Amino acid sequence: MLLEEIQSFTHFDLLAQKAKEGFIAGLHKSPFRGFSVEFAEHRPYNPGESVKNIDWKLLARTDKKYIKQFDEETNLKAHLWVDISGSMRYPQDSILKLKMGILGAGVIAHLLQQQKDGFSLGLFDEQGFLYRSSIKSTRGHLQQQIGVLSNHWNQTPKTTADTAASNINHQTFDSAVLQVGRRHLVVILSDLLWDPTETAAEAAFWKNMAMLRFQKCEILLLQVQHAQHEFQLDLGNRPVRFIDLETQSQIKLQPDEIQEHYLAFERERQDKIAQQCLQLGIDHFLSDVSEPLEQTLTAFFVKRSRLH
């Protein structure tokens, strides 16, 4: 399903279920299998067994083969965090980036509840979390969180912008991270756009990601993008008025005159994100609004299965 074809569809729950079915069709096993796995003990290796779980470091020290055994929790606990900040409301006439993040969270929520895994939903902007639910695995909990996502799906660009009003009480990102349990799964759907003049916000984000990894949490980072405009600056040769969706400041520029400098800056920014994810062991994937969501999610989890 392409977002441009379904953006005006109001029955969000049906959309999420249909996208989930398309996503599952592209996989051969549960996409969340193996997340809550913890090392338990060693046992001697028996000839003829698979060598997959041999502890090679222990072999080098003792010259004996031992198998690493793992305990897998029966129920996964997950946190779905969706960025609803101003930069996600692009393009202004269709808010495709925000809708991709919302639909992605809806699909994953359905998958988790289907497996009887508990999850919480969080919505955040540049000031922190506007909404965070408790962790539950019931059908009623799923329907409640789908309702929250549906409200944002069906909002107009204007009402969506009003959601991030400064008079709403926010929970800080730091506080939310401290409430995440050990070995939980955290899925973040965001464009990862920060004001380049305010480096503290970006540094704080990666500090919190490092804290989650220290707690042995798995992090799946789906970076939502409008590649044609944001990565390529493909806006034609006419003058364009650029509007900051978070501060509403404006500037009029000729795209082809700044394209070279902009693309160099964007490449450097993406390289930095990729490097941070690599260093922290975060599974990172780009999600373009021009691609079907099922294709994006399938590719994301296939990539993960090859890495783990």
Where are these regions (language model features)?
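Exposed, interaction-prone extracellular/peripheral surfaces
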Residues: M1-P31, P44-E49, L58, I67-L103, ...
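N-terminal juxtadomain amphipathic helix
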Residues: V51-N53
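A positional/architectural concept
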Residues: R33-S36
